[in-house]
Amino acid sequence: MNFDQLTDEQKQQLYLQHLQQQQQLQQQQQQLQQQQHQLQQQQQSYHLQQQQAAYQQQNQAQLQQDDSYMDEDTSELINQPPVQLDHGSPIRQQPQMSAFMPSPRFAQSESFDNHLNVDPNNTERFTSMDSMNFQPPASTFTQLGNGSSTNLSEISSGQNSLLSNHSVNNLPTALTSDTSPPVQQHPQFQPQQQQQQQQPQQQQIFQQQQQQQQQQQQPQQSRAVVNQSVSTEAANSDMTGSNTKYVYFERKPNLLSKTTQDKAASIKLTLENYYTSSVSHAIERNQRRLELENKIANEDIGSSEERKNRQLQNLGKKESQFLRLKRTKLALEDFHTVKVIGKGAFGEVRLVQKKDTGKIYAMKTLLKSEMFNKDQLAHVKAERDVLAGSDSPWIVALYYSFQDSQYLYLIMEFLPGGDLMTMLIRWEVFTEDITRFYIAECVLAIEAIHKLGFIHRDIKPDNILIDNRGHVKLSDFGLSTGFHKTHDSNYYNKLLEKEPSNTHLQPNQLTSGRNSVMVDAIHLTMSNRQTMQTWRKSRRLMAYSTVGTPDYIAPEIFIHQGYGQECDWWSLGAIMFECLIGWPPFCSENPHDTYRKILNWQESFQIPEDVHLSPEAEDLIKRFLTSAENRIGRYGGAEEIKQHPFFRGVDWDSIRDVQAPFVPRLSSMTDTRHFPTDDLASVPDNPAMSKAMEQRELDAKNGGGRKNPKEDLPFIGYTYSRFDYLTRKNAL
């Protein structure tokens, strides 16, 4: 096995397996050594008793045979307990004493034994623990914990003389006693004198080895302790080896470079998004399985088991196909641009055709740099989440989303009927029946958004699209919010360490941000229909510009006093007013007056006397354009609005199946006659868009993307693929 070819994960697993084997082996050695030590104590006690009895019998026999032994009084020596004996005692020289004291074999034991018989002229001795008082150490193996600074390579290569306490205490030792009286040795103990002479040499060598070990461990232990707050008890436990060793680390990310911190944050968000999306996909997959099983269970009893199993197998194939196709990376080069059908401050909308399948889509392109500079990160994330989380027929469908170094791409369904603003420019005023139809469908569309937990906050005729059958769908969720942390600008300000932006709008403040509600001054007279038509065309151009449209925004959004879903109903009331009367309720000659009128709606709002409305229509408009506390739909939601008399006779369940007042006539699937593409010629190109396109081409040639990982943090997890569309035949 080539170690260099292994991955980091395999290396880590191999290291952990090796470490576990070493720990198990050390535990087995510890148990074996403890058993040997217990047996050793028992045998030592037994042999010591036998040797003491034999020694007493021999002395008594010598005293009876030779009176020369009586020159010294040995009765006191014989009566002493067998502890703390001097090195010259015959008991210390018995071969049985050392036969049951094997030392445990460690990594350095062989090299240690090789140095035992050196320097025979050295007579220096050292004292050790007496065998009768010997206690086994608490830890009989070299522990490699977090607190140990021992290097495994040093142990295996023999560079460090590391011995456990047990191996030290089990070495043959002798006690010296300069004051003990000399005792004449029996002739049978003479052969053991050579071993007695070698023991002081062994003791000296061991003492030197122990000193070297302590000197080597001191700098290693000082390097292992990182945190100065380690307690004295923990330090003592490290010296004795009786407790588990720990190393305390203090996190100091500020000491790292800014690039390293950005990379760490990018990895953190990537992992968070990966596991979050994995769990979400697993839940959706299980939900689809349960829905199919419930559908099969509710079918006729006569359905065969083969048919049911075939349906389950087809679902499994779709799931496998989805996982494969989901890993297919899309790029701008996979699409052919047919025509640009919309422009804005942060990007544009194109009619595109996928090269391999020929399918037609609407591609919304957003410039990343403008998202940063104009503080639109939260808005673009909210828009993507709304489109990805919805399968409602009232919301434009999102099929794919992807990104490159410069742009974000949203691949959506193409709605060839244009938008409601185009219809207002063409027809000027709607009848109450036509208004009832479109307002009723808008109620259902806004209800679908609210059920997803989002607030649109930018309901206006430009964002109400018409499909090929003439029915309504909502789009452009750039100002929507789901009250999620990623839909809050402060989240990205903290992520990117930016100063919080001041989003409070002032009457005399003109800004180019998406939150802006200011428009260019337009001089008009309310009684002049021709001037109103000019205003509408100018309004269309403002939709392409960097300024927003304040005419449909609720007053509570301006003053930042807190708002809820009821702010969308205010916008719907303003649209209803424009459909029946011909202009927005707070339209003024300049943006400052529009702003002031909305804030002072109690004095500025009025229905023209020359316009005749039904009492039901007038009442509904007034209940829409009122304070948030009294606004219709605040407490009862869409159901409360559906019960209003103005919608009497509306079939809410099948309204999408009825004939629409206007059905677009199309000559081809790429027909864009209902989009004001001619007006786009007068809209100048955004210099940032041109610069970004050049940078994108340069990045493609160099084979790389953004060099700063910090700029990619807000866009992690932006890629999306829809299951029900991707699993269709030839979806890609």
From Swiss-Prot:
Its EC number is 2.7.11.1. Residues 111-240 are annotated as: Disordered. GO terms for biological process: budding cell apical bud growth; cell morphogenesis; cellular response to heat; cellular response to neutral pH; cellular response to starvation; establishment or maintenance of actin cytoskeleton polarity; establishment or maintenance of cell polarity; filamentous growth. The keyword Coiled coil applies. It comes from the Eukaryota. ATP binds at I341, G342, K343, G344, A345, F346, G347, E348, V349, K364. It catalyses: L-seryl-[protein] + ATP = O-phospho-L-seryl-[protein] + ADP + H(+); L-threonyl-[protein] + ATP = O-phospho-L-threonyl-[protein] + ADP + H(+). One of its GO terms (molecular function) is ATP binding. Residues 335-647 form the Protein kinase domain. Residues 648-730 form the AGC-kinase C-terminal domain. Residues 160-171, 185-221 have a biased composition (Low complexity). GO terms for cellular component: cell cortex; cell septum; cellular bud neck; cellular bud tip; hyphal tip; incipient cellular bud site; mating projection tip; nucleus. The keyword Ribonucleoprotein does not apply. Its main location: other. Residues 119-159, 172-183, 222-240 have a biased composition (Polar residues). It is an enzyme of class 2 (transferase). Serine/threonine-protein kinase required for wild-type hyphal growth and transcriptional regulation of cell-wall-associated genes. Involved in the biofilm formation through phosphorylation of the master regulator of biofilm formation BCR1. This is Serine/threonine-protein kinase CBK1. It comes from Candida albicans (strain SC5314 / ATCC MYA-2876). The gene is CBK1.
